Design a protein with these regions (language model features):
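Loop/turn segments within WD40 beta-propeller blades
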Residues: 33-35, 41-48, 67, 85-93, ...
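Acidic, Ser/Thr-rich intrinsically disordered and amphipathic helical segments
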Residues: 50, 59, 81-84, 94, ...
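Blade-level signature of beta-propeller repeat domains, shared across WD40, Kelch, NHL, RCC1
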Residues: 172-205
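Inter-blade linker and blade-boundary elements of WD-repeat/beta-propeller domains
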Residues: 1-40, 61-63, 67-84, 112-126, ...
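Beta-sheet-dominated scaffold domains
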Residues: 114, 127-131, 138, 144, ...
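WD40-repeat beta-propellers
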Residues: 1-3, 60-64, 104-109, 127, ...
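Conserved strand-to-loop turn within each blade of WD40 beta-propeller repeats
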Residues: 54-57, 97-101, 140-143, 185-188
Length: 205
């Protein structure tokens, strides 16, 4: 009986290079140039073979545990590092991403371009879907602010903006799965909790 966790390589991340870019001449440099830096990942809630990987280069890759040698799809829309990718809890094709390029983007996995973009004017460290609704999500930024959206009520603007941290970058956000509470973690190891209003805690859609 094994008493420790063992790592298993699922896929080697390869750079997706635009066709109009020049070829790298040096072989060693070409090898390094061909590897992508992974920043985040998330498994699909409805098909645990499918997962997304966000990269340092701004690309998002759809991968499968059944096909370890290639990407199923590559999504282009961010131009800086992708800090988080999150599948929707109710719709198997929908996911969110956030990036150092100041934006949150919503995607359909069958389309390689974003279907919606939200600009928060500074780096977005994390984004999270609410566990009780398909249209509510929260995000945190390097300025220390917490944003809450509900696409059913307002498709283009946040419903709530609140300073989550004082003089610290907010890095992570998480919904409590039982109570109407959001937790925000910062770069200094601090965690703050916030209670959601009733208008943002409606049941699944």
């Amino acid at each position: 009986m094994k008493n420790k966790l063992e790592a298993e390589e699922v896929i080697k991340l390869k750079l997706v290079i635009d066709q109009d870019k020049e070829l790298v001449e040096n072989k060693k440099e070409a090898f390094l140039y061909g590897l992508a830096g992974g920043m985040c990942f998330d498994f699909n809630k409805f098909d645990d073979h499918l997962f997304l990987v966000g990269t340092e280069e701004g690309k998002i890759h759809l991968c499968s545990k059944a096909y370890s040698g290639q990407y199923l799809e590559t999504y282009e829309g961010h131009y800086l590092a992708v800090y988080a990718v999150k599948w929707n809890n109710f719709h198997p094709r929908t996911f969110l991403s956030c990036s150092a390029d100041w934006t949150i983007k919503m995607w359909d996995k069958n389309l390689n371009r974003p279907i919606m973009t939200f600009d928060l004017t500074c780096a977005v460290g994390d984004v999270e879907w609410a566990p009780y609704s398909s249209t509510v999500f929260a995000a945190v930024t390097s300025a220390g602010n917490l944003y809450v959206y509900d696409l059913k009520q307002e498709k283009h603007h946040h419903l709530c903006e609140h300073p989550a941290m004082k003089k610290a970058k907010a890095l992570h956000v998480s919904f409590n799965k039982v109570d109407p509470i959001i937790l925000v973690g910062d770069e200094r190891g601090g965690v703050n909790s916030f209670k959601l209003s009733k208008s943002l805690t409606k049941g699944p859609l």
